[in-house]
Amino acid sequence: RSIMNETRLPRFHEPKAPRFVLTDRQGKFALGIGGYVRATAEYDFGGIVKDVDFYPALIPNKGSADRARNQFQMDISTSTLFLKLVGHTKRLGDFVVYTAANFRGDGKTFELQNAYATFLGFTLGYSYGNFMDLAALPPTIDFAGPNGSAFYRTTQLSYMCNKLKNWKFGVGVEMPSVDGTTNQYLTINTQRMPDFTASAQYNWNANSHLKLAAIVRSMTYSSSVDNKAHSKAGYGLQASTSFNVTPKWQVYGQVNYGKGIGQYLND
């Protein structure tokens, strides 16, 4: 049970430790099955976004034909199911294999959210990237989260070191995601290089921390003018924090700066 709780991802919308757990005869391995059903309802008086999530970039201009004066919506597609296998071996120490999905696919179909394994500080699989801070995201009813925050999932191989007291250091090699404005002459190409990330985090109590993160990337595109592939460098810097002023008052915040990281930020 302690491993189940300690390895929970620190995001408000992530499910807690499972209620149903199966263990082997020796008690070295445990498989947890869990999830939740979540329904939200909202009413918009001023015509915001024709989407169950709030994305400021989708707000139509005043006078636009897409602008709705009033709008009522309900959604249950963020309901989540997950499987979590935890255990301990001599070679791997404590390990976790985790997979989760909700119904956010096209037509509310089942969609993968996380699928990864962690052992000896390594994370291998599909999960949240290193250039973001789950613990610095405030609790929100809206599933998309706060505007301007770094938020993305990616296939990765990352390593987190927490052997120093109060400190965590992380590095990662991640599958890139490139998006941008194209035209008849320019198209997004297959990518040649992974994204490289690094982070350092200092914790001064269980609910307070300061994190610095960076990302370096190469973005490849094709031009029909010279029939060649070109690359542009991108980078990002992030400072984030969360700390408790009182036992019931938690402060969250983050600042992001960079070039070519727009697809990793909530808009």
Residue map of PLM features:
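Detector for outer-membrane/organellar transmembrane beta-barrel domains
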Residues: 203-267
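Outer membrane beta-barrel
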Residues: 23-53, 63-179, 192, 197, ...
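Intrinsically disordered, low-complexity segments enriched in polar/charged residues with Gly/Pro
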Residues: 8-9, 110, 146, 187, ...
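General secondary-structure edge motif
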Residues: 15-16, 61-62, 139-140, 233
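Solvent-exposed loop segments that connect transmembrane elements
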Residues: 56-62, 179-191, 220-229, 263-267
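Cleavable N-terminal export/targeting peptides
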Residues: 1-11
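Short linear interaction motifs
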Residues: 10-20
